[in-house]
Amino acid sequence: MLNGLWLGFFVVAAISALAQWLAGGNAGIFAAMVESIFAMAKLSVEVMVLLFGTLTLWLGFLKIAEQAGIVEWLAKVLGPLFRRLMPEVPPGHPALGLITLNFAANGLGLDNAATPIGLKAMRALQELNPSPTTATNAQILFLVLNASSLTLLPVTIFMYRAQQGAMDPTLVFLPILLATSCSTLVGLLSVAIVQRLRLWDPVVLAYLVPGALLLGGFMALLASMSAAALASLSSILGNLTLFGLIMLFLLIGALKKVKVYETFVEGAKEGFDVAKNLLPYLVAMLCAVGVLRASGALEFGLDGIRHTVEWLGWDTRFVDALPTALVKPFSGSAARAMLIETMQTHGVDSFPALVAATVQGSTETTFYVLAVYFGAVGIQRTRHAVGCALLAELAGVLGAIGVCYWFFA
């Protein structure tokens, strides 16, 4: 599927560019597309360099966590749940503990920690893969849940709104939590249907129901706090958790007589191997996305949606927020730029800007996640991963629009 999708980006971009040249006389469109290709190739290297340092750091700390038995302990605690969701992964396998750490880091918005931990988890799952170039069911479930963007503290969205002068930067907090819950639930259900997982199993429910209650209680607590208190808590909790994880790994490692420095260096060496494998996949995906954006195809799609909504007689205010939704699966930086542009054009507290902020906080850069996570282990056949991830993305967008009409219309 990824092969056809990648080719499709170029074909759609070419058709769009030809239409603009032949019908509109815009001969400069081809120069813009070529420029975008080289710009994205440069960006791929820059992203890899940034990932290299982060990966080296966190793979070193994770090696200490493994030697100290932390990852093994997490795997045992969640073993009964993952035996039902990922039956091909043996009980107590290190991948299970790493997956747990990754979800925890994602939920707290700790992207710098989540990505390296996630890549380590994907490599651990790859050790169980009988066909190294084809994604396994466990790898697909892990990737789709990653791409569903479940975040409890969307600090960056608050920051963007504050920079643009919002009266209450955290106004979109609950809408984001509700919308991202939609995307995660749909992602899990879609994979469960395809892989025939039994989510109603008593053991699965024993984990999921208390987790949902804890999440609901946490959301209720945060919703009762003032904007200033919430922003302060977000910053303190994120940084404290990040540093706390590091100290936890080091102290438990020292207590277990692990040679923490030597172990850190040994684990950090793996960062280079992971990073160098990413570059071809990043170049391929980002260049295709860049061409699609530069061709104007996304703008054509937006105009078509606007006309369709008007023809149906529906409210069209949300359409002005769709640029963020349309580019988010392809590029986080482009979606961020679209969000800020929407805020500046319509006003930071306007309905389109509120929808765009909620979309930005409740969706993920699906194709980037796909390229990074599968690229790190050489997966070429993604099977149903793309379809399920995009379905979760769509659920997040529709959920964001619906929740914003509920809260703000």
Residue ranges of model-derived segments:
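Short glycine/serine/threonine-biased micro-segments
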Residues: 11, 58, 67, 107, ...
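Membrane-embedded alpha-helical segments and adjacent helix-loop junctions characteristic
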Residues: 30-127, 227, 256-345
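Hydrophobic alpha-helical segments, principally membrane-spanning helices and signal/leader peptides
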Residues: 38, 45, 94-96, 131-139, ...
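C-terminal transmembrane helix pair
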Residues: 113-114, 121-162, 166-196, 322-409
